[in-house]
Amino acid sequence: MTRRPLLVSSLAACFTCAVAVLGAGFSAHANAADICVKVEVQNVRAQQGQLMVAAFGDAASFGKKPMSQMRVPAGEATTTFELCGLSGDTVALTMYQDLDSDGQMGRNLLGMPSEPWGSSGKPGAFGPSWDTAKVALDGSPIVVYLTQ
């Protein structure tokens, strides 16, 4: 069995989530709203582009098929919005700030994100996984910190 280095595996997981956000057809509220939650995004580059947000309901769909997704204009350094269309008792959010509003996450020559990105929960240094990004839908706001 061949083992991939941890860095490569972790980056692949991060980019898988980014692809899910990028590949999703964005709309204000893609699914019927069952549960709504307040989302607070910190470290936003104020007034630049938009936040591309995807919400996943379980490990099987994480990075593949979001249950809800939306675009949010980048406001202040801390941007707050309501995300609806959620169900269940757990959710994981992934997002990036599309600085140039081209609908795609910018990448450098190594394929690393060149635009700010983040996830809910306690993301690892090399990108989120379901286990690190999942948070309870208990009425508390979800806080996401964007990595520059």
Model-derived regions, located:
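Beta-strand signatures of extracellular beta-sandwich domains
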Residues: 52-56, 92-94
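Acidic, glycine-anchored loop motifs typical of Ca2+
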Residues: 99-106
